[in-house]
């Protein structure tokens, strides 16, 4: 409900067509991250106390990444308080939600020079590990790839239980792990 509320606020701000900076007219991703942070703070101010009274902790985070013409691709993690951090060469990715199961795979395998296809495969293996280890995480998954300087989605795949590529990766990963221990 918190993330949906923040997304609705962001959409309302775009539709209002005021001079205010929105996701649609932000000059860079830093300013876009400020827009998302502002929406989260507004949701917190409006709903946090009511949620607390129901025993629910106000906890929401977003990952915002992409490229605006004239700047390099950037990646931000935006926290529930509306503050945010930007990815660096030392921390080139972010995960939100249940990350403890799949994170070690990404930490050991990824490198900045890795082709997008390999990075996508690593992300899917990471998600498979999380799905296998936590009943609250499951399919379907959405995999979206945006290439540098293309300014559009180059690939969008909905991954469900029937996706043959995902099944093949799961099987190969499991076989490789079993082989190491035999």
What does each model-found stretch correspond to?
Residues 48-54, 63-65, 73-75, 131-134:
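A generic local secondary-structure boundary/capping motif
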Residues 27, 31, 56-61:
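Glycine-rich, flexible loop segments associated with nucleotide phosphate handling
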Residues 2-4, 69, 150-151:
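Short, glycine-/Ser/Thr-/acidic-enriched flexible segments
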Residues 39-44, 54-58, 65, 121-124:
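A short linear-motif detector with a strong N-terminal bias
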Residues 1-49, 96-103, 107, 111-114, ...:
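Conserved short S/T/G-enriched processing/targeting/catalytic segments and their helical context
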Residues 1, 57, 61-67, 79:
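Short beta-strand segments
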Residues 59, 72-182:
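A two-mode feature
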């Amino acid at each position: 409900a918190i993330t949906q509320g923040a997304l609705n606020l962001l959409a309302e701000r775009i539709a209002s067509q005021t001079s205010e900076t929105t996701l649609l007219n932000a000059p860079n991703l830093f300013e876009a991250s400020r827009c998302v942070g502002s929406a989260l703070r507004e949701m917190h101010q409006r709903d946090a106390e009511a949620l607390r009274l129901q025993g629910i902790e106000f906890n929401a985070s977003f990952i915002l990444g992409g490229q605006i013409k004239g700047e390099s691709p950037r990646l931000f993690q935006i926290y529930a308080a509306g503050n945010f951090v930007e990815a660096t060469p030392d921390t080139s990715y972010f995960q939100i939600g249940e990350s403890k199961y799949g994170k070690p795979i990404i930490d050991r395998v990824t490198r900045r020079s890795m082709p997008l296809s390999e990075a996508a495969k690593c992300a899917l293996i990471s998600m498979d590990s999380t799905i296998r280890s936590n009943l609250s995480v499951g399919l379907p998954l959405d995999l979206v790839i945006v290439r540098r300087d293309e300014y559009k989605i180059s690939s969008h795949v909905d991954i469900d239980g029937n996706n043959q590529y995902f099944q093949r990766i799961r099987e190969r990963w499991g076989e490789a792990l079993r082989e190491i221990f035999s």
